[in-house]
Amino acid sequence: MTATPLTNLFLRAPDITHVAPPYCLNATWQAETAMHTSKTDSACVAVRSYLVRASCETSGTIHCFFFAVYKDTHHTPPLITELRNFADLVNHPPVLRELEDKRGVRLRCARPFSVGTIKDVSGSGASSAGEYTINGIVYHCHCRYPFSKTCWMGASAALQHLRSISSSGMAARAAEHRRVKIKIKA
């Protein structure tokens, strides 16, 4: 099997123009079962649940940060398939090494990014107008002290990584568009 050049990967990346700062999810998961386990946030008035879809090869407890991502200035959310493609790209080993290089720390997990969902449902008797579902990118962490300063520094590095990769995808598509225009004129 031949390796896919990174430029081709960036051309296929979804068009993500905005990555919001991290939101810490008030729950923990067992890494082995996090792919299909939904957790409910007991601190919320409404019923709020989190699905992180983490596929982790490391065992133990994980905690997560959620990043809302949008495709344009109108805050159009990407489709789940686009989010999966983006998570696959940022988890691609050469791309993930960039995050490790920025942090100066080796990650304990080969796939720290996944597609996540926050679902908020109004309490009984309330109107359905307050219900919402947000899909985005989740970064999970294995550190011993959830949401400590070190953990937040990792989430901040993950935010910068996501923003950098989304910018690289937009730049690759713009360059390809210019190449196509030049070929057509020639």
UniProtKB/Swiss-Prot annotation:
GO CC entries? host cell nuclear matrix; viral tegument
Q: Which InterPro entries match?
A: Herpes_UL55 (IPR007622)
The answer to whether keyword Disulfide bond applies is no
**Where does it localize?**
Virion tegument; Host nucleus matrix
Coiled coil ranges (UniProt) are none
Name the GO terms of the biological process aspect: viral life cycle
Superkingdom, natural source: Viruses
- Tell me one Pfam family matched here: Herpes_UL55
Protein name as annotated:
Tegument protein UL55
List the top taxonomic levels of the source: Viruses, Duplodnaviria, Heunggongvirae, Peploviricota, Herviviricetes
